[in-house]
From Swiss-Prot:
EC number: 1.14.-.-
Lineage: Bacteria, Bacillati, Actinomycetota, Actinomycetes, Pseudonocardiales
InterPro entries, sorted: Cyt_P450, Cyt_P450_B, Cyt_P450_CS, Cyt_P450_sf
Originating species: Amycolatopsis orientalis
Protein name stated in the entry: Cytochrome P450 165B3
Encoding gene per record: cyp165B3
Pathway: Antibiotic biosynthesis; vancomycin biosynthesis
SUPFAM superfamilies reported for this sequence: Cytochrome P450
Length: 398
């Protein structure tokens, strides 16, 4: 950490880019997070090849956290806190394989095709509301902070009349401005709602993710596993997509010559979305990997039990990844970025995220071809304390 920026090195950003000191840190380096009695030392990987090696090797690196000193690294475990049951990132194969296989019915190609018309409808509903409010308007408040939650509720199977309440509970138990007691109460209410919904789905499976899983696997997927996975889906999909929408629009407005990619064919839009995902990389890092044994990585001696943090934004700006990698180029052929992770923990919802972003950006410029920054000289307000990078406000005009 530095006096100028107290945040851990792996989450430092400057505008749309990773911080210079993060990019200059080296392929694999030691970092300290926290201070005093709370200080923890980790390895931090920034090179694309090293990040892929760590995330892709579940034999040597575990994602499962130990909550008991007797628990072997990456073992089946003797204790997992309730909040981590169903969180795929806290499971290693074969546990991970078993659970992920049961959850894939909610993310099939058929499921994504069924979701497409709804996503288009919710995006246009939000754009209608923004247009009615008049120019200028805050794109974050009207679109970026609204679309992802609505899409995720449809995916999971939350009844439409419950969705406003459901999202308030989801956001409330993460709100750092609330007391710990209040957040815990909201989190408990959120969990109880999910368990009640799962019980209903077991009696009469619907078309959402929970219904698809219980229809195919029944009691083989436990209530707690389904509850935990729903929490993971909501937390990962909401913040990440909100961040990508805001930053993506800002990036395109700063590079207006590239907006035509979303006015052309679907293949051009798909390529543009993939480049925006790589260039912006809103998640800072996945769950730290724990070395299962002594090993050598990028010339460094890693000890069994050492923690490795993988910086996804830095890895996706590694000059070894592609020529001119610091430049946004939506016509670039897709390159093997790690914004969705890598290996067995590659994001299960990657196809949904791409579909959602492609719909938002395509419909936005179809509806508002003259969209522009309301005040190009205004300082941009970035979210610095949320799990994924994003904007607090983006005033646009048309």
């Amino acid at each position: 950490m530095s006096e100028d920026d107290p945040r851990p090195l792996h989450i430092r950003r400057q505008g749309l880019d990773p911080a210079d000191e993060l990019l200059a840190a080296g392929a694999l380096t030691r970092v300290t997070i926290g201070s005093g009695a709370d200080a923890e030392t980790h390895w931090m990987a920034t090179a694309h090849a090293v990040v892929r090696q760590v995330m892709g090797d579940h034999q040597q690196f575990s994602t499962r956290r130990r909550w008991d000193p007797r628990d072997e690294i990456g073992g089946k475990g003797i204790f997992r806190p309730r909040e981590l049951v169903g969180n795929l990132m806290d499971y290693d194969p074969p546990e991970h394989t078993r659970l992920r296989r049961k959850l894939t019915p909610g993310f099939t190609l058929r499921k994504m095709q069924r979701m497409a018309p709804y996503i288009e409808q919710i995006v246009n509903d939000r754009l209608d509301e923004m247009e009615r409010a008049g120019s200028p308007a805050d794109l974050i408040a009207f679109v970026a902070d609204k679309v992802p939650g609505a899409v995720l509720c449809e995916l999971v199977g939350v009844p439409r009349d419950d969705r406003d309440m459901f999202m308030k509970l989801c956001h409330g138990h993460l709100d750092a401005s609330l007391s710990q007691k209040r957040r815990a109460a909201l989190g408990d209410k959120f969990s109880r709602y999910l368990l009640a919904m799962i019980a209903r789905e077991r009696k009469e499976p619907g078309e959402g993710m929970i219904g698809a899983v219980v229809a195919e696997y029944g009691d083989d997927a436990t209530d707690e596993e389904l509850r935990g996975f729903c929490v993971q889906v909501m937390l990962a999909g909401d913040d990440n997509i909100s961040g990508m929408i805001g930053l993506g629009v800002l990036a395109m407005l700063r590079h207006p010559e590239q907006i035509d990619a979303f006015r052309g064919d679907e293949q051009s839009a798909q390529r543009a979305v993939d480049e925006l995902i790589r260039y912006l990389t809103v998640p800072y890092s996945p769950t730290p990997r724990i070395a299962r044994e002594d090993l050598t990585l990028a010339g460094q001696e890693i000890k069994k039990g050492d923690s490795v943090i993988c910086s996804l934004p830095a890895a996706n700006r590694d000059p070894a990844l592609a020529p001119d990698v610091d430049r946004l180029d939506v016509t670039r052929e897709p390159i093997p970025h790690v914004a969705f992770g890598h290996g067995v923990h590659h994001c299960l919802g990657a196809a949904l995220a791409r579909l959602e972003l492609r719909t938002v950006f395509t419909e936005l410029w179809r509806r508002f071809p003259a969209l522009r920054l309301a005040d190009p000289a205004q300082d941009t307000e970035f979210r610095l304390t949320t799990p994924a990078y994003g904007l607090t406000e983006l005033m646009v005009a048309w």
